[in-house]
């Protein structure tokens, strides 16, 4: 996957390209990240990238010319058909379904806003989709862009050692993840559930599914409203609820 970044602070993306799973993906050639700074396209000595909004009001907007030129440069450098995304609080809220949809694209350009945002005409003419990571405001689009890259890159074949890791994560099947345990077997008097040490793969699968359903019911019940549960899932959830109420 190729990702083009348009940002006033491209150095921030070193946390994506140099570290962790995404850093390894870059080293393996599975993920390529390039950046364009609108300051490099400014025409004045001060490299100005902000401008006053029409109608007055507090704050500034990103200047049209440097931003548009940076976007055009990123588009020209793209190796193929590219989806252009503007990270914005007004965009579609990113969730697991959205992540999987975006992962189908081979090339993405992510525009990171600053100040009070960008000229609406830039969005209308240059942007394919707007995405948000939540109903809150940040100082810029860089962290949302990094969040998007991190989540989408997990679905690039070869990025994760075991692709099942992505398929079994929270929200991958519409449910929260089940509890996980590692050594020691006993920690502060609390033991690892016996079923996980049994070696019975079917029992372990059912236990994990039950815990996943139960955790979703307890913490995010609204997620269950959008799911068509199988007979097995209905049975396991009923068992979990009964067990919880008898504790």
Swiss-Prot record:
Example of a GO cellular component annotation carried by this entry: cytosol
EC number of the protein: 2.1.1.228
InterPro entries: Alpha/beta_knot_MTases (IPR029028), tRNA_m1G_MeTrfase_C_sf (IPR023148), tRNA_m1G_MeTrfase_TrmD (IPR002649), tRNA_m1G_MTases_N (IPR029026), tRNA_MeTrfase_TRMD/TRM10 (IPR016009)
Alphabetic keyword roster: Cytoplasm, Methyltransferase, S-adenosyl-L-methionine, Transferase, tRNA processing
Subcellular localization, as worded in the UniProt entry: Cytoplasm
Domain of life per record: Bacteria
One annotated GO molecular function: tRNA (guanine(37)-N1)-methyltransferase activity
Catalytic activity field: guanosine(37) in tRNA + S-adenosyl-L-methionine = N(1)-methylguanosine(37) in tRNA + S-adenosyl-L-homocysteine + H(+)
GO biological process, any: tRNA N1-guanine methylation
One Pfam family named in its UniProt record: tRNA_m1G_MT
Chain residues that bind S-adenosyl-L-methionine: 113, 133-138
Stated role: Specifically methylates guanosine-37 in various tRNAs.
Annotated family: Belongs to the RNA methyltransferase TrmD family.
NCBIfam families in alphabetical order: PRK00026.1, trmD
Subunit structure: Homodimer.
Protein known as: tRNA (guanine-N(1)-)-methyltransferase
């Amino acid at each position: 996957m190729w990702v083009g970044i348009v940002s006033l602070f491209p150095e921030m993306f070193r946390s994506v390209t140099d570290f962790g799973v995404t850093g390894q993906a870059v080293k393996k050639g599975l993920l390529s990240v390039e950046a364009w700074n609108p300051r490099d396209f400014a025409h004045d000595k001060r490299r100005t990238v902000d401008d006053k909004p029409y109608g007055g009001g507090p704050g500034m907007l990103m200047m049209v010319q440097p931003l548009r030129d940076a976007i055009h440069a990123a588009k020209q450098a793209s190796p193929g058909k590219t989806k252009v995304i503007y990270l914005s609080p007004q965009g579609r809220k990113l969730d697991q379904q959205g992540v999987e949809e975006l992962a189908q694209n081979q090339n993405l350009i992510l525009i990171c806003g600053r100040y009070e945002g960008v000229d609406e005409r830039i969005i209308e003419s240059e942007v394919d989709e707007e995405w948000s990571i939540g109903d809150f405001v940040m100082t810029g689009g860089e962290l949302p862009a990094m969040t998007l890259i991190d989540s989408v890159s997990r679905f690039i074949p070869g990025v994760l050692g075991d692709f099942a890791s992505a398929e079994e994560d929270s929200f991958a099947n519409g449910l929260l993840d089940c509890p996980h345990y590692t050594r020691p077997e006993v920690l502060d008097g609390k033991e690892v559930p016996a079923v996980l040490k049994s070696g019975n793969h079917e029992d372990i699968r059912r236990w994990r599914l039950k815990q996943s359903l139960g955790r979703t019911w307890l913490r995010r019940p609204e997620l269950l409203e959008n799911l068509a549960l199988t007979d097995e899932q209905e049975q396991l959830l009923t068992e979990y609820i009964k067990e919880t109420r008898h504790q």
